[in-house]
Amino acid sequence: MATTWPPCRIIRKSGGLRGMWTLEYELQRSGLGPVAGVDEVGRGACAGPLVVAACVLGPGRLEESLDDSKKLSAKGREMLFPLICRYALAYHVVFIPSVEVDRHGVQVANIEGMRRAVAGLSVRPGYVLSDGFRVPGLSVPSLPVVGGDAVVACIAAASVLAKVSRDRLMVAMDADYPGYGFAAHKGYCTRAHSLALTQLGPCPEHRYSFINVRRIVTRSNTRAVAGFTPAPPAEHGECR
């Protein structure tokens, strides 16, 4: 009879910050390690890249400090970032540019980013844990964990790597495209960002497949920076 991995007992044992290592440990003990966590940031932004990170942590590393990167302060994430880079057995960060998000759609770009992040690890994982949804096409077994960035250590580490990497890029982007406030809102659709979009029109880093960006382009008949032609969108999205 076929065996389903990981066994249900492993899933039941994991959960909560105390159990952050339980799922990874049980997978390792079952001969399915090393275990990699993968997570993304920037799905709901209407500007900037989608950033995906994969991470394989050493046993017992940073458990008490890790949590979903969205719950940590910016200072806390910045403090954790070099520690994760130092103590992780392997990690890899992938940037999916806005034009690729427009061409393929957020979901397809997200899955492709996760594949690339896992493929880029210097240590081949035996098992992959992803945050929230299944990642088809991986060369190793995988399991989605709902809310994984808050209950699985390697996913939490990947979440921090992705969040800090993207935030730093958006701060640098603010200097390249002044007036949009990228350093403050990181490309998400705040009131200030919407106002800047209306006044300035979109720049090459905006996602034209997102309906709020397309609406402004259509309404104002605005052109982006000279020489840039947005790719036709594969699907529509909107900032959340």
Curated annotation (Swiss-Prot):
Residues 33-222 form the RNase H type-2 domain. It is an enzyme of class 3 (hydrolase). Its EC number is 3.1.26.4. GO terms for cellular component: cytoplasm; ribonuclease H2 complex. GO terms for molecular function: manganese ion binding; RNA binding; RNA-DNA hybrid ribonuclease activity. It is found in: Cytoplasm. Belongs to the RNase HII family. PANTHER family: RIBONUCLEASE H2 SUBUNIT A (PTHR10954), RIBONUCLEASE HII (PTHR10954:SF18). This is Ribonuclease HII. The lineage of its organism: Bacteria, Bacillati, Actinomycetota, Actinomycetes, Mycobacteriales. The gene is rnhB.
